[in-house]
Amino acid sequence: FVPSILISVSLMAGISSLVLPGDANVFVVPTLQMAFGLCSLILLYFEGIMDDLVGLRYRVKFVIQILCALLIVASGIWLNDFHGLFGLAGLSPWFGVPFSVLLVVFIINAINLIDGIDGLASGLSIVSAFFFGIMFCYEGYWGFAMLAFSLMGTLVPFFYYNVFGDAQKRRKIFMGDTGSQCVGLILSVLAIRLSMTLPDEQPKISGIIIVAFSMLLVPAFDVVRVMIHRFRRHKNVFEADNSHIH
């Protein structure tokens, strides 16, 4: 997924600069966010490869996921406003930064855990990516809109071969931990960035935080339900089982 997404983003950026040379700057993402985000994505990508090939203990995976989340918030992408949700508005960095780290790790694992049947994780992610792309276009954040649509464009052919591919003819592909975790990371970044409030800008959509995270409601609900299910049965909440909604 990561190489395909990087190629898609680069291709779209190149085409946009040729078609709209005067407005090419609107597609630029801040350098710090791009650099830290790319490092986070590559780190999670290699962690996923190692997990798919040899298997990693969940503690090791959590440490790497937390490092990836720290890179994201260090780039300046963290949830700084609840927009009136729970009676809260602007958030202090002392709360917003650690909360954002936990949120990124939560969404990464939510997408990873719901990847249990063909087309489920990729189908939900396609809908979410399309929604984020439209919302970022409406808000005028073209760089993040490009990222969302690139993710969607990468997932659409995968969805076809994952659902309709023939395994006997070697035409069926699977997401694995590598793909699902990277998709979860990108979706978490898109959701948090869409919900952020910048000093000189205000969201055009009222209750933007609810709108942003509503796309991730199904995988989030599954994670919470599964953890409660395991806890009630005195099982390790981080150990895999067959108690998911799928």
Label each residue range with its predicted role.
Residues 1-2, 16, 22-29, 48, ...:
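Membrane-helix boundary/helix-loop-helix interface segments in multi-pass membrane proteins
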Residues 78, 84-87, 116, 169-171, ...:
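Glycine-rich, flexible loop/turn motifs
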Residues 75-81, 102-110, 163-169, 192, ...:
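Short, highly charged low-complexity linear segments
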Residues 90-120, 124-133:
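Hydrophobic, well-ordered secondary-structure scaffolds
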Residues 5-23, 27-46, 120-246:
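Alpha-helical transmembrane segments
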Residues 53, 92-93, 230-234:
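A short, structure-level motif marking secondary-structure boundaries and short turns
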Residues 46-54, 107-114:
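Membrane-water interface regions at transmembrane-helix termini and the short interhelical loops
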